[in-house]
Amino acid sequence: MRISALEGCRVALWGWGRESRAAYRTFRAAFPKQPLTLFCTIAEATEVQALADPVLSIETEVSVPRLAAFDVVIKSPGISPYSPLAVAATAAGAHFIGGTQLWFAAHADTDGVVPGAVCVTGTKGKSTTTALLAHLLRAAGHCTALAGNIGMPLLELLTPQPTPEYWAIELSSYQTGDVARSGARPVLALVLNVFPEHLDWHGSEQRYINDKLSLVTVTRPRIALLNAADPRLASLALPQSDLRWFNRRDGWHVRGQVVYRGDRAVLDTALIPLPGAHNGSNVCAVLATLEALGLNAVALAPAACNFHPLPNRLQFLGERDGILWVNDSISTTPHATLAALDCFLGRCRVAVLVGGYDRGVDWECFAARITRKVPLDIVTMGANGPHIQALLAPLAAGRFGLHAAVDLPQAVALARTALGAQGGVLLLSPGAPSFGAYQDYVARGRHFAILAGFDPEVISSISGLGIA
């Protein structure tokens, strides 16, 4: 559905996050006098009323009959279509679309392809990978947009001037289905990895995997680029796309800490400001993307050394009193926490803070791995903290310290005490979402920075968003 098709329709917005705000501005720019209804919270309604929009109706209670009363409901990506309310509304005739769906439909050419669109998804690493891709495309002299789930809704760049040559677009599992439903196809779709996350939104592990992979299985990109080291991805067959791989010995891969193209050594990852073996894989993904687009990836690889890392992703805040503070607030799965720990274990003393919102993710894998290479201390916190504590308690004796905190300030205090005068690394890598305690992972990371004694404004901005 294109935006023009909304003219004369009964339209509602459901949610008032950043994506919905962008959808509101887009709708109002196209149809200044057309009535619009917004379903939002009471707190959000106060903010929205300040817009003084005479043809905007605000409702703070949402129901099946009200949703079904509209021709189209533009839904915030954070609202699950699998929730009982959304399912019942759909059965009653409600038609939901998303802002990402509107953008892709608006930009598709006559063949259904969105020129220059490179979509990046994966359970972890997608923000860093998308930003690094934009960085290297710009280093090659190409006007490139960096947008999507990374922090700039696509609808904020609906009709940019000049039109970018490339679009580096990060997509969450909430948004990949939007692309599939738009009928549009990206030039290239990159999938980094897939393991269980967002089970509360998707309802099951298999549905999460299906929704995530719809970017390549349903959307049919011209080029599908997959991680050969991921078992779920390695088994895919995509006959309607040009299927490419990274993390294979005959292509882009990492040996030790060096990035190779086949047998040719190209780049030492120690020169790139992205710690961890997982980031070496992300670099390979970006270079394989550039190559698939027909660019000289080998020549562009050194420009990765000038990349500015993103906040809240293994972000080195600085050192205070012998303690190196590392903010990995983006970590929302146990797999991500294990990857963060791998950057430090065996090299220095580490106290790690884990736990947060409980969405039913299994921590058994964390417990199994943590005994092989142990940190100095683990501090649990948040709603799933007691569950993690119970899993780790039988393993801790004589191996690592284990403490329980009620919140982040107490967790930080316990970790500082554990590190003591000898110091070490104090790592926030929760392996769980921030909901319930914070608005989002950014707010959690900012609070961590304050507790560490650093200015949250300095460490929170993402450079390069938009078009450059």
Swiss-Prot record:
<feature type="binding site">
    <location>
        <begin position="122"/>
        <end position="128"/>
    </location>
    <ligand>
        <name>ATP</name>
    </ligand>
</feature>
<keyword id="KW-0963">Cytoplasm</keyword>
<dbReference type="GO" id="GO:0005737">
    <property type="term" value="C:cytoplasm"/>
</dbReference>
<dbReference type="Pfam" id="PF08245">
    <property type="entry name" value="Mur_ligase_M"/>
</dbReference>
<keyword id="KW-0961">Cell wall biogenesis/degradation</keyword>
<keyword id="KW-0547">Nucleotide-binding</keyword>
<dbReference type="InterPro" id="IPR036565">
    <property type="entry name" value="Mur-like_cat_sf"/>
</dbReference>
<comment type="function">
    <text>Cell wall formation. Catalyzes the addition of L-glutamate to the nucleotide precursor UDP-N-acetylmuramoyl-L-alanine.</text>
</comment>
<dbReference type="InterPro" id="IPR013221">
    <property type="entry name" value="Mur_ligase_cen"/>
</dbReference>
<keyword id="KW-0436">Ligase</keyword>
<dbReference type="InterPro" id="IPR036615">
    <property type="entry name" value="Mur_ligase_C_dom_sf"/>
</dbReference>
<comment type="similarity">
    <text>Belongs to the MurCDEF family. MurD2 subfamily.</text>
</comment>
<keyword id="KW-0131">Cell cycle</keyword>
<dbReference type="GO" id="GO:0071555">
    <property type="term" value="P:cell wall organization"/>
</dbReference>
<keyword id="KW-0067">ATP-binding</keyword>
<dbReference type="InterPro" id="IPR043687">
    <property type="entry name" value="MurD2"/>
</dbReference>
<dbReference type="GO" id="GO:0005524">
    <property type="term" value="F:ATP binding"/>
</dbReference>
<dbReference type="GO" id="GO:0009252">
    <property type="term" value="P:peptidoglycan biosynthetic process"/>
</dbReference>
<protein>
    <recommendedName>
        <fullName>UDP-N-acetylmuramoyl-L-alanine--L-glutamate ligase</fullName>
        <ecNumber>6.3.2.53</ecNumber>
    </recommendedName>
</protein>
<keyword id="KW-0132">Cell division</keyword>
<keyword id="KW-0133">Cell shape</keyword>
<keyword id="KW-0573">Peptidoglycan synthesis</keyword>
<dbReference type="GO" id="GO:0008764">
    <property type="term" value="F:UDP-N-acetylmuramoylalanine-D-glutamate ligase activity"/>
</dbReference>
<comment type="pathway">
    <text>Cell wall biogenesis; peptidoglycan biosynthesis.</text>
</comment>
<dbReference type="GO" id="GO:0008360">
    <property type="term" value="P:regulation of cell shape"/>
</dbReference>
<dbReference type="GO" id="GO:0051301">
    <property type="term" value="P:cell division"/>
</dbReference>
<dbReference type="InterPro" id="IPR005762">
    <property type="entry name" value="MurD"/>
</dbReference>
